């Protein structure tokens, strides 16, 4: 899907942490001791990071800032992930956001005020909404436009803008 959308804007709302920025420790934690799942997640991370580094890439990512706060605290799904691993993950996110900017732009909104389902919008060609175990693929031009407009509204209402994102992630304290 990324290849088909080369040269077009990709809009991205991650389900958890941004896939392309996961560290090996976070991948291992998410894989829950399954070597096969760990390898699959690592390949996915590597592929998405490679695509993001290509010069024709234009990716906007928007997510609730609370997702990163919960991660830093080691709460919710992240209970049990060592504080050191979480610190390293946050540092990796900040560094990667800086490295890829401006072709990759991360925006953070207040999840108490707005909601966005996990999804990727590939230009105006297609959209994939993550439903937990699978993706709902959308090809309707009008639905894709509606999703893109909703995504753009999240950017307009962002509390943390792309040029501030790396510094905002760095200020998070792990507990």
Regions found by a protein language model. Name each.
Residues 2-174:
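Hydrophobic protein-protein interaction segments
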């Amino acid at each position: 899907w990324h290849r088909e959308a080369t040269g077009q804007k990709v809009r991205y709302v991650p389900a958890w942490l941004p896939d392309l920025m996961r560290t090996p420790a976070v991948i291992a934690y998410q894989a829950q001791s399954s070597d096969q799942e760990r390898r699959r997640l690592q390949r996915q991370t590597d592929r998405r990071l490679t695509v993001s580094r290509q010069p024709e890439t234009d990716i906007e990512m928007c997510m609730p800032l609370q997702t990163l706060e919960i991660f830093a605290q080691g709460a919710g799904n992240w209970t049990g992930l060592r504080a050191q691993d979480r610190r390293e993950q946050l540092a990796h996110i900040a560094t990667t956001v800086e490295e890829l900017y401006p072709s990759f732009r991360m925006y953070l909104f207040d999840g108490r005020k707005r909601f966005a389902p996990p999804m990727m919008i590939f230009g105006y060609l297609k959209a994939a909404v993550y439903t937990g175990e699978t993706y709902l693929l959308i090809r309707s031009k009008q639905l894709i436009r509606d999703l893109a407009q909703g995504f753009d509204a999240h950017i307009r209402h962002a509390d943390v803008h792309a040029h501030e994102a790396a510094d905002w992630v760095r200020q998070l304290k792990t507990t």
